[in-house]
Amino acid sequence: MSDVLPPNSTIPSSNVPRAPSKWWREPELALLLVLVVGAYFTRIPALTIRGEESRRGLIAREMLETGDWIVPRCQGVPLFSRPPLQNWLIAVAGSFRGGVDRFSLRFPSDCAILLTVLMIYGYARTFLSKLGALTAGAAYASMGQVVELGRTGETDALFTLLVSGSLLVWHVCQVRGASPYKTWCLGYLLAALGTLTKGPQAPVYFAGTVGIYLLFTRQWRFAFSRAHVAGIATFCAVYGMW
């Protein structure tokens, strides 16, 4: 008997990878939280302003002062070298602190690192043991460049969260047999937010990686569907709102 499934058949539910229903209560995840909070949140304002942080802070400050959250400006001059999502988050953090300072400048990046680690752990638990998921999350949190850039007000940490999120969320939905509309729309939603963070690299990374995966696994027909069109429309709607 052939082991190849008929074209319209589905994988038996018993063979579909699923994360434990309460993986967020596992002590290994708590250990990761302690690691990230200790490494990233305890000394947020300790470093001096460096790199592009000053520009990010000035743009966020002008957003708060002028009330114009659409056009990013630095010293009154429109600046479109980077989309504004990172600046929005810095400005929101600054509004709770009475102004943009080193804490509000870096807090969004630290939160992005934390959320990325949580996402990696949850994704890994779909396929790996607790130890494997712990290792995956700790490996990301302790990477040299992540530690360096994750403690600054640069866009890299947030961009990584959104682009990796678009890929991991799409893949989890796809392997679990979620609605194709949910799969594509969530993936493109996160890719659109990534575009609002750093530019058009996000949809290239998302579509390119997903396309190669579908070709490699011989599931390329999954890309030719109304659900995929709905996902692209979601991307255009989210990015177009800016």
Residue ranges: model-predicted function:
Residues 2-242:
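Membrane-integral, polyisoprenol-dependent glycosyltransferases
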